């Protein structure tokens, strides 16, 4: 689960991280009221959407030469003028896709005199099974670009979970970021704070880009992106309250209601599979035969007929889907239950695209018989390779 920048900053500030004074606003009236209470004289007006690249983004409704989704203002009047121009508009960035995202809230904060921009993030390093810091002196840039062009400017530092962030870790991070004097002292305080927040709140990503050194020598969190492990949200009702469903794919929201693991992709072949590993393999073989999956969808090990029907509705809600592949290995999951769900779903949604079903495992013969006796136009497959070839051929022939 993602949250907005202003929410991430509030959370980090609760742990003691240095942030600027700021306020989230939903209207022009709020913007004028609260901007007057900020110290000024420099303000930053920032679009709040779940996507990066906001500063270089463009609003669909405005002139192509208009400013982007992050703007400087030198007076309250300029703040208000920018809010009027930005609020309710559709911001297109490199991460939103061409459809963009509507800006329903803005964050107004004090400006800062910047001396240097740095990059800092925490993530789970699966290679070593630890939370790791990733830092670079090249802040304000796309870290993937830095990794590709100048990897020597990036330090990845895994943290020993039994010791936490040690003084030695702090020294290495400060050296990598070239921090001195007050900035170094701030860094030695900040790194343990961020690690504590990451672990206690079950984050999957904490990214600060940039972390700035101001002209007064101190550090400040200028931008923050935080993602949480969805599987741990039951432990954090306070975090769950920060969820903004308007920023999420409606299909993914509907899937979560039925305990389905769903991720929308950009292809044309819808997939319904049980088990994450099998789902990944299914997507891989679809690509192998020259097509693209439209989604990742894992129905889990104990899906009911109702759950399967819900999965079909979610897949067919995507207008890009030109065919569907159901690939089930019945271990805990019974193939006859899947078959009943498939038949019920096809009848309920009035399926108009090709459907290939591959079943194997528990009660497979009963499952195949249910589909065969249904009289529906379902293409059976003997194995995964056969299923992938059939659905790709059916879609290309459609």
From Swiss-Prot:
InterPro entries (alphabetical): ATP-grasp, ATP-grasp_succ-CoA_synth-type, ATP_grasp_subdomain_1, Succ-CoA_synthase_bsu_CS, SUCC_ACL_C, Succ_CoA_ligase-like_bsu, Succinyl-CoA_synth-like
Domain of life: Bacteria
Keywords: ATP-binding, Ligase, Magnesium, Metal-binding, Nucleotide-binding, Tricarboxylic acid cycle
Enzyme kind, highest EC tier: ligase
Record note on cofactor: Binds 1 Mg(2+) ion per subunit.
UniProt-annotated binding residues for Mg(2+): 209, 223
One MF annotation (Gene Ontology) recorded for this entry: magnesium ion binding
Enzyme Commission number: 6.2.1.5
DNA-binding is among the record's keywords: no
Catalytic reaction equation(s): succinate + ATP + CoA = succinyl-CoA + ADP + phosphate; GTP + succinate + CoA = succinyl-CoA + GDP + phosphate
CC cofactor: Mg(2+)
GO biological process, one term: succinyl-CoA metabolic process
Record carries keyword Magnesium: yes
Segments forming domain ATP-grasp: 9-254
Binding residues annotated for substrate, in chain numbering: 274, 331-333
Record-linked Pfam families: ATP-grasp_2, Ligase_CoA
Binding-site list for ATP: 46, 53-55, 109, 112, 117
Pathway stated in the Swiss-Prot or TrEMBL entry: Carbohydrate metabolism; tricarboxylic acid cycle; succinate from succinyl-CoA (ligase route): step 1/1
GO cellular component: cytosol; succinate-CoA ligase complex
Family stated for the protein in its record: Belongs to the succinate/malate CoA ligase beta subunit family.
Known function: Succinyl-CoA synthetase functions in the citric acid cycle (TCA), coupling the hydrolysis of succinyl-CoA to the synthesis of either ATP or GTP and thus represents the only step of substrate-level phosphorylation in the TCA. The beta subunit provides nucleotide specificity of the enzyme and binds the substrate succinate, while the binding sites for coenzyme A and phosphate are found in the alpha subunit.
HAMAP family: Succ_CoA_beta
PANTHER family, A to Z: SUCCINATE--COA LIGASE [GDP-FORMING] SUBUNIT BETA, MITOCHONDRIAL, SUCCINYL-COA SYNTHETASE BETA CHAIN
Subunit structure: Heterotetramer of two alpha and two beta subunits.
Protein name: Succinate--CoA ligase [ADP-forming] subunit beta
Species whose genome carries this gene: Bartonella henselae (strain ATCC 49882 / DSM 28221 / CCUG 30454 / Houston 1)
